[in-house]
A protein has these predicted regions:
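N-terminal signal-anchor/start-transfer transmembrane helix
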Residues: 10-25, 99, 237, 241, ...
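Alpha-helical transmembrane segments
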Residues: 17-21, 101, 305-307, 440, ...
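Membrane-interfacial helical/loop segments at transmembrane boundaries in membrane proteins
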Residues: 60-76, 198-217, 407-418, 487-519, ...
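Aromatic-capped, Gly/Pro-kinked transmembrane alpha-helices
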Residues: 74, 487-529, 540-651
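Hydrophobic alpha-helical membrane-insertion segments
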Residues: 38-55, 179-192, 389-397, 470-490, ...
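Hydrophobic alpha-helical transmembrane segments
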Residues: 76-94, 215-236, 425-434, 509-535
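Hydrophobic transmembrane alpha-helices and their helix-loop junctions in integral membrane proteins
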Residues: 100-144, 150-466, 477, 483
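Transmembrane helix-loop-helix hairpins at membrane boundaries of multipass inner-membrane proteins
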Residues: 1-5, 23-120, 193-220, 247, ...
């Protein structure tokens, strides 16, 4: 039964997405959104039912191949399903946020000519993400990985007549291909070592190859397992937008706002974090890989958060917040606190989707204005959006009692107790990141909702119910889900059958027993007070003394320029690497393709054959005496050769 239910949960969004894509214009808007919403709702209900089954039987793990995709000799590549605690948790998060986005889209996209196409894309994306998290082997993981990449490309460039959207989706596609190259190499290395792509077989035999090495040069060799982990993490860096492969995510805000909530908050960008947790049996055997993961996550968490302080596009501020929070999740994975990483992934999915959709509500109310400098005073005009945005903001900064408080504090607590190399550096990075998060979050909140309305003549009102209902439904878990779930998800062994966590790194199991003890402990630490201090600083800078931010940007102009130019990563990629490869491509085209292949090989061969033919053709004059002369000359040469050969002069 579990197999059939899992298959239905996976296939339903695919079926409804295809239905909307092929027949959407014929069946109408109401039927299009109805059938796609029903598909995701069915998948969500099944996911919740599977969770109930697992809670009744904590040891329940379903791992079964559906069919053999390819068989070569003794090698078999299969498509299968792995249903365990980690899988079902991700299924619920993906389906719930997807359902909210589907409902939200009814109002947000109701006037868009691509309405049916949009519903098709988001349903197919949901299927791709479910395929990724439900896979039991690297082959299916890769298919799902690439499928979400393709759907992201289509959704970012949904408004394909908009030049900036086309550039953004191309940029996302190219940057992710760099990460995917590392992922492919990592999978290929594992296949060459183990002769299989099945998770269970690889994880069970991983410890036996810890002494195996790969010689990268005559003087340098590396553990094959470490190399595989680093390559896999390279793939995660692209999908989860870790520095320096982070530049695609802010530009992806060119797509419709619902996509920002679905792809760039709750699902696709967390795929890399999910993979790190799923691959914990491999990463736990390589301290080098864990330290590398930790350092990259730490740098991403603090550096991308700083960029959020200087952005003025409402969606880009939240996008840089997403980058920073992804860094937090990666940091937790780097100190082997996979349960804390996954817990923050889940709470973040709710409150970040809420913030993106609330931003969309503001954009709709202001007739598609996105510059926060042109906003203000919307508190009384958009009361529901205001309250839900406040809930999302408090959850994001980790205010006591909200979901983000429990997940972020658990994560930071794990880092503070870690003995992994660079954990002290990571601790200070995430601690400073708490202040930065609070600053950019309430900078955005105060500039949008407080102060004076910039244009008194503009008609501002709350959008329709289809936009407001998802905000309310997302606000509930953003506010309440932390307290009841941190105990089973983090302190207990909920993920015990999904991840490997050595007892030396499991600080939660012996330091805390329930939510109350964790709450009282956190209130005695610095994290909460740093976050609250950030709120007061933001209020002072953007409500009381609004001239100070400009003075600060002038005083610290070099640093401000560095942030405004996003550390010059875009400049480096576009004007150095892109130009270098563009020039290389043009050179290969003009000299290699045109001169060598076309002119010398293809056209040159034809030219030389023609020249030779024309010379030979001159012999065929049609005069008999010419042919007789040639016969005499040929006979003379033949006789000369016979004479010389008989005399021994010719060998």
């Amino acid at each position: 039964m579990l197999f059939n239910l899992s298959l239905i949960a996976l296939i339903t969004p695919l079926f409804t997405g295809v239905l909307a894509g092929f027949f959407g214009k014929n069946i109408g808007k109401v039927f299009t959104n109805g059938v796609t919403i029903l598909g995701v709702l069915i998948s969500l209900i099944i996911s919740i039912y599977i969770l109930i089954l697992i809670l009744g039987n904590p040891e329940l793990v379903f791992n079964q191949n559906v069919y053999t995709w390819l068989s070569i000799g003794s090698y078999k590549l299969s498509i299968g399903l792995l249903i365990d605690n980690l899988t079902v948790s991700m299924m619920i998060v993906v389906n719930f946020v997807s359902l909210m986005v589907h409902i939200y889209t009814i109002g947000y996209m109701h006037k868009d000519p691509g309405y049916h196409r949009f519903f098709c894309y988001i349903s197919l994306f949901t299927f791709a993400m479910l395929s990724l998290v439900m896979s039991n082997n690297f082959l299916q993981l890769f298919f799902g990985w690439e499928a979400v990449g393709v759907m992201s490309y289509l959704l970012i460039g949904f408004w394909y007549t908009k030049e900036s959207a086309i550039k953004a989706n191309f940029k996302a596609f190219i940057i992710n291909r760099i990460g995917d190259m590392f992922l492919i190499l990592g999978i290929a290395l594992l296949f060459s070592i183990f002769g299989t792509l099945d998770y269970e077989q690889i994880f069970n035999n991983a410890e036996s190859i810890t002494s195996n090495t790969v010689k990268l040069s005559s003087s340098f060799e590396i553990s094959s397992l470490t190399l595989a982990c680093l390559l896999l993490f390279g793939g995660a860096m692209g999908k989860s937008a870790q520095m320096p492969l982070h530049v695609w995510l802010p530009d992806s805000m060119e797509g419709p706002t619902p996509i920002s909530a679905l792809i760039h908050a709750a699902t696709m960008v967390t795929a890399g974090v999910f993979m790190l947790a799923r691959m914990s049996p491999l990463f736990e055997l390589s301290t080098t890989a864990l330290s590398f993961v930790l350092i990259i996550g730490s740098i991403t968490a603090i550096s991308t958060g700083l960029l959020g302080l200087v952005q003025y596009d409402i969606k880009r501020v939240i996008a840089y917040s997403t980058l920073s929070q992804l860094g937090y999740m990666v940091v937790a994975a780097g100190v082997s606190a996979y349960s804390a990483s996954l817990f923050h992934l889940m709470t973040h999915a709710f409150f970040k989707a809420l913030l993106f959709l609330a931003a969309g509500s503001v954009i709709v109310a202001l007739h598609h204005e996105q510059d926060i400098r042109k906003m203000g005073g919307l508190k009384s005009k958009l009361p529901i959006t205001y309250i839900t945005s406040l809930i999302g903001s408090l959850a994001l900064i980790g205010f006591p009692g909200f979901s983000g408080f429990f997940s972020k504090d658990a994560l930071i607590e794990a880092v503070s107790h870690s003995s992994v190399y660079a954990s002290e550096f990571a601790y200070y990075c995430v601690l400073i990141g708490v202040l930065i998060t609070s600053l950019y979050t309430f900078r955005l909140f105060f500039l949008v909702f407080h102060g004076q309305l910039k244009d008194e003549n503009i008609n501002v009102k709350e959008p329709q119910l289809s936009i407001l209902i998802p905000l309310i439904l997302l606000a509930i878990p953003s506010m309440l889900i932390g307290w009841p779930t941190i105990g089973p998800l983090v302190f207990n062994d909920f993920f015990a059958n999904s991840i490997i966590q050595p007892s030396s790194n499991d600080i939660f199991g012996y330091e805390f027993t329930d939510s109350y003890h964790f709450l009282t402990h956190s209130l005695s630490g610095p994290v909460v007070y740093i976050a609250i201090f950030g709120i007061f600083v933001s209020y002072f800078l953007y409500i009381l003394k609004t001239d100070i931010p400009e003075k600060l940007s002038t005083t610290f102009n070099p640093f401000y320029k560095l942030l405004i130019n996003k550390y010059y990563f875009d400049y480096l990629y576009e004007n150095v690497f892109a130009r270098l490869f563009n020039n290389l491509g043009n050179s290969l085209w003009s000299k290699g393709d045109i001169k060598i292949i076309d002119n010398f090989i293809v056209n040159g061969t034809a030219y030389r054959v023609g020249r030779f033919s024309s010379r030979v053709r001159e012999i065929q004059s049609g005069y008999i005496y010419h042919y007789a002369l040639m016969m005499v000359l040929g006979l003379a040469l033949f006789l000369a050769w016979v004479v010389f050969k008989s005399s021994g002069l010719v060998l």
